[in-house]
Amino acid sequence: MSHTADIPLEAPTLLKLASSSVQSQINNDEYMETVILPVPLSQELFARFRNKWNIHNHGPAPVEHLGPPTDEPRPDQGNIDMIKQVFRIWSDSTRLPLEKLNLTGATVDDQIFVDLLHAHAHSITELDLTNVTGVTDLSNAYLYARSTHFPMLTSIRMTSMDLVTGHQPRRKNGIASTEFRALFMLGEEALAEARGQMERDGLRSPLSPSSQPSSIQSDHQSLDALVPCDSPVEPPLITARAPNVKRLFLPRCPAKRTTIDEEEQNTHVILTKILSPLQQLEVLDLSYWSKTDDMRCLQPLSNTLTCLILYDVPDLYHAVPNICHMTELRILDVSQSNRDSGLYPHPVTTLNKLIVSLKYLTHLDISSTNLATQPSSHDNPARYRESVRTDICGLQSLVRPLKYLGLFNCESASHVREIPAEVVSGDANEDQVITSLQMYKDRAGLLQNVLNESYQLYRFGNSNPLTRHTEALHLVLEAMHRHLADSTLQIAGSASLFYIIRKVDMNRDTKRRVVSALLSGMEVHMEEQVMVRNCCLSLCQFEIPQDILFDYSRLAVLLVSVLQHHNADNLTQRIVVFLLNSMACHVEGDQKVQVGSYGAIEMILDQIARKHTANVCDDVMEVGWSFLWNITDETPVNCELFLNANGLDLFQKCYEAFKTERELVRNMMGLIGNIAEVDELRSQLMKDDYVKIFCALLESQEESIEISYNSAGVLAHMVSDGEEVWKQMTVCRNEVMQRIVEATSSWKLATRRFINYRSFRPILRLLPLYHAYASQHWAVWALANLTTTDGEKYCAYVRDEGGVPLLEELVSNAITTTDIRTLANTVLENIRNVENKRNPKSIPADLAHSSNSPTFVPSYVSDVEEEDEGDVEADEEVQDFVNVDFDDYALPMEY
């Protein structure tokens, strides 16, 4: 399979390193009150905190409390407090100057917001208030009271309209909106009361006499609290305080595009009030506005405006004449998210009129409209000029090809042969889809459809070879990051990722980004079965657990949660159990304890119990027991969790129901073996029913010795506890020991094992137990077998873990049985052969027999025993249900 190279890794810049160092001192008041930073470092540090509060914002939105106030803190109170702290620190512009003030995603109040703006009023050139909450039209009054102006500000971006629409008082039903006579307005006395209340609450009021404009300060007339007012004074909007703004981005929130204020006040009046102070405006974004009528409010900007973005503004056919008067336009975007709102009565004529009128146009987006449709008998304008080759009739009057043309979701327009543009967004080929991902990354409505096209493209391919997987990967990741709360978009993105990541040689950072995106999507949309399945399928393409160790705990918690929420979806269950089993392999005890602490053992047992009740033995059950085997390996805490959850009862039930399922029985006995190795827990196995099962399995050697070997190991540990603990049993201990020896003697010493030991300590502890000759026999056979079949690996384990002296003691002790002595000599001979092979001249024979050699445990030896990585057949069985047929399950969305 061919792969595309990932983007190169980049070392952190000095600026990032420096900002990281300063960030660590944020709670050091003495440091933060004295530090002085240059603008670039102050900007970078502020951006770090912005990223931090936006990460917290990805959690569930706080539910608005109804009724009287309570003392309970908001769920996001910690994040709000952090934002306030950051705003207060940066309100000292002398030490922490800012030129670009980006407050995206912040939750603030008017007071602290105005403090920050006022501090940097004379230096900021860009102001970004995207998704800022808590700011109201009261901020305009505060700015007015403090005479704050922004002479350097050239760019404003915001999604909340309060700062630009001003206060719109709601009227009672039946009162005309133009009737203001005999209305009452609070006067100075009421203002003084409000100021006193604010100061009692610990807030500094910007409306105190010392901070008011001189005209207000000089007004000492005694006014009643309520006085008739024919012309109430309204504070100027923020645009009136920044007359040099050239770029104004005012996209409304799609979910709140129709508000009461908008219904009560003509949109033309609102926009005129916003735009009239901006005599130098060049770029204007009014995306998602509605009821814009003919947009005559744009006429005063006809000589300056070069970019007009009207994405998802409905019924734009009313505004075409006024748009055509904007003759300086270079960029025009009239695209829609839905075709229904982008229908023009005479589309070909309309597009032709725009092209003829806007002679400087270089970028045009008409996605999800009918403007690129073919002409009809009543809609076929005459060609104004013949300059370009095009199969789109409405563009025939172009003087030169466009630099960019948006044609996504314009029926088949992006598939025609002649398109007069250098770059095109559409769905005809990979280049068009990549361009669409780039252009519509902020537009959820269009982006969802683009991601669906991406899914189709990278799953089924195209007539041309696909070569831009890496770009697609990073664009899809960005889309999922920007629109985490949109479940349909997350589903489409996760499905695309499934097919893209298999063709990219991802570097470390990209792997982390992909895993984080999948986990975040799954975390926020846990109830969406398709989303959860897509994410789990994509995770199966990573090396588990290596690629997820950086977020190991989070994934474990999520997978357990998936088992709880989606226990009826068999495919999802199979994938999750496989992932959990993979996570339990090849990790150290601490991480296994973590997984156990999140309830994974209990959840897996619950799934196994469901399967048993349904009398079904499938992948979920088999891999579930494999997970339990791995998660309890050398981890007594997890063994105890298994026992406390009545795991032994379930073991007995599953054995009785499915005793012919060899893989299942093998996994179950591996788990029981882990429990048998724990001295404090082994007594719970001392029941006649369990011992009879273990003894019966000693003779199970149909395909391999694994089940018989595991059963003998369990019994070997049980009989090692001595005669006393067996007195309560009806099964005779001596008879059990004899059966262990008989089973062990029947195994072929050269049998290759499907087990991967990383420590021999549990086995070596049985060697000195002369009161339990069967335990010795099983232990020494295991050592002889492993050092014979894989001496290069296991001889070092015996020597380094102190096994040589124990074996020599067995050989020399008179009460050792002949078979045990023979096996012990075999192990010692294997060790000598391996050592001589490595250093044939440097190791004298007498040293090879020495029992005084020091015991040393190397760093590569751990206390964990796990399934053999070399067990190719077993591994393929587990992998089969992950890799086969999954192409039919990763879905972009349910149509």
From Swiss-Prot:
Region feature Disordered, mapped onto this chain: 58-78, 195-221
Cellular component aspect of the GO annotation: Cul2-RING ubiquitin ligase complex
Compositional bias ranges of the Low complexity kind: 205-220
Taxonomic superkingdom: Eukaryota
Signal peptide region: none
InterPro entries: ARM-like, ARM-type_fold, LRR_dom_sf, LRR_Zer-1, ZER1-like_C, Zyg-11_UBL_adapter
SUPFAM superfamilies, per the entry: ARM repeat (SSF48371), RNI-like (SSF52047)
Gene3D superfamilies: Leucine-rich Repeat Variant, Ribonuclease Inhibitor
Keywords: Ubl conjugation pathway
Subunit structure, as described in the record: Interacts with elc-1. Part of an E3 ubiquitin ligase complex including zer-11, cul-2 and elc-1.
Protein name (record): Zyg eleven-related protein 1
Organism: Caenorhabditis elegans
Lineage: Eukaryota, Metazoa, Ecdysozoa, Nematoda, Chromadorea
